[in-house]
Amino acid sequence: MRSYRTLFRTPEYTPFLLSFAAFAAAQTIGGLALGTLVLRATGSPLLSAVSMFGPQLAQLAGATFLLSGADRLPPRAILSGIALAFAAGTTVLALPGLPVRAVFAVLLLQGLVASLGGGVRGGLLNDILTKDGYVLGRSVYNMLWGLTQMAGFATGGALLALLPPPACLLLAAALYLLAALVTRLGLTARPPRSAGRPSISATWRTNALLWSSRPRRLTYLGLWVPNGLVVGSDSLYVSYAPGAAGTLYACGALGMFVGDMAVGRLVPPSVRRRIATPLRLLLAVPYLCFVLRPAVALSAVAVTVASVGFAAGLVLQERLMSLTPDDLAGHALGLHATGMAALQGVGAALAGTLAQLTSPATAMTLMAAGSVTSTVSLAVLGRQEERRSAAPGPHPGGLSEPAAAD
């Protein structure tokens, strides 16, 4: 599948995207409104930030224990239920005079409910698309996410200039209801991909199974570590250039859009499997110039070029799917989303600590150097695994999957 026309003719792909766009728009508009509401109520930038990103942290905890449900529950029902739960929770958040403790209790519940969302959506996308259409379809999904974030934050900011935060939260709740409706009417009722009941023990057993394969381990590390270290650099835009942080983030979004479009649409599969390492190096190398503390214009160019390298995620996700049984696709993608969120959080914390001890520019450079080092190390390990798998005779662990070659 090499054309957008063929992609959008795929049954259910368009309603899948529309439901996701409505959900993402609700998240951005609602998150900005809630952060503003908490800041006005408490005067605390910390509580405001946690109110916006707290559900993601709770989602990380929930996915650690509940991820087996991504393949053991019917996807349409789960996605509709998640959207309805967010609509109800966001409506509660809009209630006047709601105590801050109650706000964070609702956010915790929302995060736990959403812990299945990434795995269920990823597995459903894998079901909807053919194998040769996954990268193109995922690239459009990623581009839509970036565009929706930019439009959602811009729209949310404009709405907050005209309306009070509770009114914006009610608008977000309506968008969640729209996402649930589109999911219910536009998607087919599929059975679970895997038999059995979701449980904590099943989650841990499947996590262990996915991690037991060395090619999959290398693929997961390639998805998480270089990306997380560079996101640490990204987190320092505000302290590096307070007056131009928005410009740098916009340039990063532009680079991601270009990279996803190019890799998903223009790069043939025979080439795609060989460019994971070059793309991961591209993701980090331009940040090395920050050691010279470049002006905003040059910084914007470096950020734009570097962000094209985020398209490595498409290549590595395609590899992950080739290494994973279809009945574990949702769990495997959910584990990827969980690990990536964790490593990005670690990267941001590490970068902030380095910036406190040195300077934002030095910290960004060090994080980029760490990303380059991790990419080179993983490439060497991948080559060793490729040679080991190609050697005659039995291999330790009895792996039958292809090696994680770069």
Can you name each region flagged by the protein language model?
Residues A21, G89, V100-L116, A297-A311:
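Hydrophobic core of transmembrane alpha-helices in multi-pass small-molecule transporters
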Residues M1-Y13, A189-L221, H395-P402:
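Juxtamembrane intracellular "pre-TM" segments in multi-pass secondary transporters
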Residues P45-L46, K131-Y141, D326-H336:
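Loop-to-transmembrane helix entry/capping segments in MFS-fold secondary transporters
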Residues V106-L147, F153:
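Cytoplasmic helix-loop-helix junction between adjacent transmembrane helices
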Residues G35-A41, V92-P96, A151-L171, S239-A244, ...:
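Transmembrane alpha-helix termini and helix-breaking/packing motifs in multi-pass membrane transporters
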Residues D127, L169, A174-R197, V380-A391:
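Helix-loop junctions on the cytosolic side of multi-pass membrane transporters
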Residues P55-D71, R76-A85, V92, Y240-D406:
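C-terminal transmembrane bundle of multi-pass solute transporters/carriers
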Residues A21, A25, I29-A33, L163-L170, ...:
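A single, central transmembrane helix in multi-pass transporters
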